[in-house]
Design a protein with these regions (language model features):
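Short, surface-exposed "cap/lid" segments of acyl-processing enzymes
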Residues: 14, 23-65
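Catalytic histidine-centered segment of alpha/beta-hydrolase-like enzymes
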Residues: 74, 178-190
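Acidic catalytic loop of the alpha/beta-hydrolase fold
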Residues: 151-156, 180-181
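Short alpha-helix in the alpha/beta-hydrolase fold that links the catalytic acid
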Residues: 157-165, 187
Length: 199
């Protein structure tokens, strides 16, 4: 395994990204971080946990900073420009790495963005951790979906996620006692992702 930082060109300019590369790849996983106006970056612990989960599954695992975060160009755009950034980065990776299967994962605001991305591309796997339903108009996700939420989430109430998931028929994996940031539960979170997506 190697890891490295790189840059891609997006609609607002530079996109700063980080990759975990397993060598032999079964696909590309793109991970989106929580809300940029509340300190969210690609180095968020849950974003890193998701990246390491997909690395273990054999994916080239890429997390990136939304516009206006770190050295990424631009300014916060309420999920609209952030979706375009994600799509531009996926296009860049497809050209560089070839037409590998795609997986999407996102936490909180990043889950909202990845739900939008999932409606624009063919993704083999989608994992949303505490997606920001109730805060944003999160679109339906047609793909098979792994939804993970903390029972004691103080930012996105579990009941809001049930309201969003119920009409779509999506199952929800609930971690009893876990908060929005899954304090002390990251190893468990990783195991759920890896076990869910193992062949």
């Amino acid at each position: 395994m190697e890891q490295y930082r790189f840059e891609a060109e997006g609609p607002a300019g530079r996109i700063e990204a980080h990759a975990y590369d397993p060598g032999k790849r079964r696909g590309i996983a793109l991970i989106a971080h929580p809300h940029p106006l509340f300190g969210g970056t690609m180095d968020n612990k849950i974003a890193q946990t998701l990246a390491k989960s997909f690395l273990e599954l054999g994916y080239l695992s890429v997390r990136f900073n939304f516009r206006g975060v770190g050295t990424s160009s631009g300014t916060y755009d309420e999920g609209i420009g952030e979706t375009e950034d994600a799509l531009a980065l996926l296009e860049f990776l497809k050209k560089r790495e070839g037409n590998l299967p795609l997986a999407l994962a996102g936490f909180s605001f990043g889950g909202f963005v990845q739900a939008k991305v999932a409606n624009r591309i063919e993704a083999e796997k989608v994992a949303l951790v505490a997606p920001a339903v109730g805060k944003y108009d999160v679109p339906e996700v047609k793909q098979d979906l792994l939804l993970i939420h903390g029972e004691e989430d103080e930012v996105i109430p579990l009941s809001d996620l049930f309201e969003w998931a119920r009409p779509q028929g999506h199952a929800v994996t609930v971690l009893p006692g876990a908060s929005h940031f899954f304090h002390g539960r990251l190893a468990q979170l990783k195991k759920i992702v890896v076990d869910s997506f193992k062949d």
